[in-house]
A protein has these predicted regions:
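Active-site loop-to-helix "anion-binding N-cap" substructures in soluble metabolic enzymes
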Residues: 1-130
Length: 130
């Protein structure tokens, strides 16, 4: 933050933590350890990116994404950190699932990985954002 760079802080659980019902606990710990207390929407972006979803073609359902986004917003408020910080979703985003993901509450955008290397598909996702 002191260098005037805006970090995207990626947080996410692995498959075992998710299966064991520890996803929320893991994400809270990651937030505690990685989000500076002076963070705000002008100097920080958060991205929920479940590790198990990256490159797998699988994503959590919208209910799970919403639960995580709401928990992150609550964590920001509880820690007296600007809760208008954008929260992105990343992890196997593609043109087939982007529209549904965009419908999530508290979503500030998408963190797009491999599909960003496919100009036509990436453009379609960008159009969906409008």
């Amino acid at each position: 933050l002191e260098s005037n760079l805006i970090p995207i802080i990626c947080i996410g659980e692995n498959a075992k933590d998710r299966e064991d019902g520890r996803a929320l606990e893991v994400i809270k710990k990651q937030l505690d350890e990685s989000v500076p207390k002076n963070s705000n929407k002008n100097n920080c972006i958060l991205a929920y990116e479940p590790i198990w979803a990256i490159g797998s073609g699988k994503i959590p359902d919208n209910s799970s994404i919403n639960e995580m986004l709401n928990m992150i917003k609550g964590w920001l408020s509880n820690n007296k950190i600007d809760n208008s910080i954008n929260i992105l979703y990343g992890g196997s985003v593609n043109k087939s699932n982007a529209k549904e993901i965009f419908s999530c509450i508290n979503l500030g955008g998408l963190l797009i990985g491999g599909v960003s290397l496919k100009p036509e598909e990436f453009s379609e996702i960008c159009l969906m954002a409008n």
